Amino acid sequence: MSLANAGSGKSLDDKAKSPSVVVDPAQRLGQLNRFVFGGFVEHLGRCIDGGLFEEGSPLSDNRGFRLDVLELLRPLKLSVLRWPGGNFVSNYHWTDGVGPQSARPARPNLAWGSVESNHFGTDEFMGYCAELGVAPYICLNMGSGDLAEALDWVEYCNSSAATYWAQERRRNGHQEPYGAVYWGLGNEMYGDWQVGQLDAAEYVALASRWAKAIRRTDPNAKLVSCGQNGWSDWDREVIDGLVGLVDLHSIHIYSGSPEYWTDVLSPHQAERAISYTATLLARAAYNRGISVAPRIAYDEWNVWYRTSDGTLEERYDFND
């Protein structure tokens, strides 16, 4: 990339009035990891119900998948999709969302103050991932859930044995394991908005036990520790405590300021988060004598600057 006016003989004032940039597509700076192009869906507002999933709609197929939304998502060529949360997951019990939809119990959505029908559950999510050709990334409930529930979920998704939950998956119409590789160890467990909030020491102790047990259930699982913004004391303590047990460490960055320049400069905040997190990961791996440090899962980010009604539903246009 080069400045088009460089060396043109124009004055600085002239250049400032009509700046331009030339991009050379033949100039390669490096290989881009395809998992940069990931997505995240949560049971929040119209994201799932009334968004990508709407039973009985003329716009939906017989599974309830909105065909118009699928057609918009396919060209994005997403690589991985995270579900079911987000804050929602800390009160989500996956067994409510499998089996005949008519028999699934409705539950209170404590994160967002609504009622969850549970009609879009594990099998629907896996089917949606298959439609898009993306890898599923499941976040586990470390708020109100327990280790046994998590292990059962891994078994349901990935076991080829003749065990209870693998057989239940088969009874629900899915003979072969789904092969879900990516599993998040909770969501934002540091926050007082989270059901079952933990401090960093509590989280490390709990996540250590979960990580070891999950690897016994599925040695191929890739585990993601719950991070904050990449430079917090939480991140440092969690990374130090879980290095060697997890494959990735998550960070979440949102910009939500009504101030224009705060939002314009927010990419610097993201760059700083990535840089700080990478340093903490490398430091922890070096101190433990681990040759390969965990990688970064930047699995939540966005810009909100118009929404003020508490719904978190932003309305973007071409100005953005």
Predicted region positions:
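Pocket-flanking alpha-helical
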Residues: 236
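Active-site His/acidic residue clusters
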Residues: 252-266, 310-313
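Non-catalytic accessory regions flanking glycosidase/transglycosidase catalytic cores in CAZymes
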Residues: 1-232, 240-247, 270-271, 275-299, ...
